[in-house]
Regions:
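Conserved mixed alpha/beta core segments that line enzyme active sites in large multi-domain catalysts
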Residues: 1-172
Length: 172
């Protein structure tokens, strides 16, 4: 993505020398048959004022369907998880149609595990990108994750965080 049209244009707009950028390479294990695949934002993108803090999560069963932009007719669980509120309520925006009706992709326990990880990631990276670094305004991290039981088949799936990076912010 370093040389995609969009990133090239953005560097040009901001006057960044194209030869001064580097590309990072991330290598992680393969997840050929994960139980759940998702992306999350560690702040509520629908709440610019910060008055309704929540984690925004898109998650799909398995790994066959794209999560954020699935094929036509496929829906993911899309939700707001109010992790810091009493009883940690979850508001579903859409439900996956790849799981049985009236069920969710993640269990309550998995949602809580994800919330703990997202909270830790948000807090840790605040030192570089958020309020702890003196930055003001809306701050969030974009996190890719999986739940997989390959290391212990038949046991509850383990949460794997594939990557976390600064979220560009409310569509900007």
């Amino acid at each position: 993505s370093t040389w995609s049209f969009r990133t090239f244009e953005e560097r040009s707009f901001y006057g960044i020398d194209h030869h001064s950028v580097g590309m990072a390479l991330l290598i992680h294990r393969n997840f050929p048959d994960e139980e759940a695949n998702g992306v999350a934002v560690t702040a509520n993108p629908f709440d610019a004022a910060g008055l309704d803090p929540a984690f925004y999560v898109n998650v799909q069963a398995g790994g066959d369907a794209e999560v954020v932009a699935p094929p036509a007719g496929v829906k993911s669980d899309e939700l707001l998880y109010y992790f810091s509120q009493p009883n940690q309520p979850v508001t579903y925006i859409t439900h996956s149609n790849l799981v049985a009706p009236n069920t969710t992709v993640l269990s309550t326990t998995q949602t809580y595990q994800l919330g703990r990880a997202l909270d830790a990631i948000h807090t840790y990276f605040s030192k570089a990108y958020g309020p702890a670094a003196g930055n003001t305004g809306w701050y969030a991290m974009d996190v890719e994750f999986k739940f997989d039981d390959a290391d212990a088949p038949g046991q509850p799936a383990t949460l794997w965080v594939k990557q976390a990076r600064p979220y560009p912010g409310r569509g900007k």
